Swiss-Prot record:
It comes from Cyriopagopus schmidti (Chinese bird spider). Belongs to the neurotoxin 14 (magi-1) family. 02 (HWTX-XVIc) subfamily. It comes from the Eukaryota. Residues 22-67 form a propeptide. InterPro entries: Toxin_22 (IPR012627). Residues 1-21 form the signal peptide. It is found in: Secreted. Probable ion channel inhibitor. The presence of a 'disulfide through disulfide knot' structurally defines this protein as a knottin. This is U10-theraphotoxin-Hs2a.
Length: 113
């Protein structure tokens, strides 16, 4: 009976020690595979990112105007600021209405000037 216990204990200790060694080996393999996958994926992601930024930066002639003010809306005559009038409108000082609130408003461009 003692020999069976000793044999069982010996087999159990060997199985546990070899099993842990396999787990460490599996962890190392997983870590290596992960780094290899990251190294393969990184150039593809950088290329995709560059293409997306390139598409955003290129404006086509059909692209719509960004954030502009409509007719009779307060504006700023300084073109560097964001409060500019849409195409077909110009930023002028108001004649009667709006003189109490803002200095300039967007009006339709006069073609006779």
């Amino acid at each position: 009976m003692n020999t069976v216990r000793v044999t069982f204990l010996l087999v159990f200790v060997l199985a546990v020690s070899l099993g842990q060694a396999d787990e460490d080996g599996n962890r190392m393999e997983k870590r290596q595979k992960k780094t290899e996958a990251e190294n393969l994926l990184l150039p593809k992601l950088e290329e995709l990112d560059a293409k997306l930024w390139e598409e955003d930066s290129v404006e086509s002639r059909n692209s719509r105007q960004k954030r502009c003010n409509g007719k009779d809306v307060p504006c700023d005559p300084d073109p560097a600021k964001n409060r500019r009038c849409c195409s077909g409108l110009e930023c002028l000082k108001p004649y009667l209405h709006g003189i109490w609130y803002q200095d300039y408003y967007c009006y339709v461009e006069k073609s006779g000037r």
